[in-house]
Regions:
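Non-catalytic linker/capping segments at the edges of enzyme domains
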Residues: 1-42, 48, 82
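Short structured motifs
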Residues: 20-26, 89-95, 115-117
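A generic structural signal for short beta-strands and their flanking turns/coil linkers
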Residues: 20-22, 37-39, 87-91, 101-103, ...
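Residues located in well-ordered beta-strands
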Residues: 25, 92-94, 106-108, 133, ...
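A short, structured loop/turn motif at beta-sheet edges
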Residues: 29-37, 96-103, 135-140
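Hot-dog-fold acyl-thioester-processing enzymes
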Residues: 44-71, 81-82
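Hydrophobic beta-strand-centered segment that forms part of the acyl-chain substrate-binding groove
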Residues: 72-111
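HotDog/MaoC-like acyl-thioester-processing domains
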Residues: 99-100, 110-154
Length: 154
């Protein structure tokens, strides 16, 4: 699988203006073993996104993780967007440690893309998880989340 990370980043920033508003930076969108996809998105340190203790606001971190998961979905399933709409179905986040400074969300496809596509081809509405880890630039995990996505046939 070949992924044009610049095209994925541009597509996400075009489709989700809120990601531009928060200043997200797309660090990497890359294939992984067995048809997997990984996306890394960065939230710079900015007073505009701080909470009451001076770190990134929980809502900004949630949006960062959801955006990274969306980049995974776009990279993995962009070829079927003419016949299916990707939608987040549900998400859960656990805030583990206080985050300070810039944070990075690393999202990975939680199910083989081929399985998801086979369900879509069979006329189903597949669901699949995208686990996300949010960490400081030093690698300290501050949050973990899972976003469950679907591909809704047109």
């Amino acid at each position: 699988m070949s992924i044009d990370s610049r095209q994925v980043a541009a597509g996400m920033l075009d489709a989700v203006p809120f990601a531009r508003t928060l200043g997200f930076e797309f660090v990497e969108v890359a294939p992984e073993a067995e048809g997997g996809v990984r996306a890394v998105v960065r939230l710079p340190d900015s007073p505009a996104t701080h909470n009451h203790v001076g770190g990134p606001h929980a809502g900004a971190m949630f949006t960062l993780g959801e955006t990274a998961s969306g980049a995974v979905v776009l990279a993995a399933f962009g070829q079927v967007l003419d016949r299916a709409v990707p939608l987040a179905v549900r998400a859960e986040i656990a805030y583990r440690k206080l985050a300070m400074g810039p944070v990075l969300a690393t999202a990975r496809l939680g199910r083989p893309a081929a399985e998801v596509l086979a369900e879509l081809e069979a006329g189903q509405r597949p669901e699949f998880p995208v686990p996300v880890r949010i960490a400081t630039e030093e690698g300290k995990v501050t949050s973990e989340m899972t976003v469950v996505w679907t591909l809704r046939p047109n």
